[in-house]
């Protein structure tokens, strides 16, 4: 049996950060634009932009910097705050996964009996 996976959601007074928002930031870093990141994740540009806006509000500072489109095309990239947010989230996720490893194995064994 495959090991159960732990999914991390962090509830802050300003809002919630979870795997979907972090995946969007990673896709923006990889794709170089909000619209391409949204397409890669199967979401509309509007939904992607709304999530970026929410992350900017949660962080209290821009996590994505976007340049307008046009003939030369636009683009987007993560700010230092955005890169830090992704790194912190992934580090917390890894620590939580390691801390829960034994209990997840016990849960899996209990559920397969």
Task: Outline where the language-model segments fall.
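Short helix-boundary/capping micro-motifs
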Residues: 28-39
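Basic, amphipathic "hinge/linker" alpha-helix immediately C-terminal to the N-terminal HTH DNA-binding motif
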Residues: 66-89
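Alpha-helical linker/hinge and terminal dimerization helices associated
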Residues: 88-107
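Short, Lys/Arg-enriched N-terminal segment that forms or immediately precedes the first helix
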Residues: 1-13
């Amino acid at each position: 049996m495959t090991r159960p996976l732990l999914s991390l959601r962090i509830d802050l007074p300003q809002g919630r950060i979870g795997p979907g928002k972090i995946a969007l930031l990673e896709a923006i870093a990889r794709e170089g634009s909000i619209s391409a990141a949204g397409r890669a994740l199967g979401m509309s540009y509007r939904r992607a932009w709304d999530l970026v806006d929410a992350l900017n509000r949660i962080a209290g500072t821009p996590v994505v910097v976007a340049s307008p489109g046009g003939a030369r095309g636009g683009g987007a990239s993560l700010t230092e705050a955005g890169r830090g947010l992704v790194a912190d989230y992934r580090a917390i996720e890894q620590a939580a996964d390691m801390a829960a490893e034994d209990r997840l194995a016990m849960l899996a064994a209990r559920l397969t009996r």
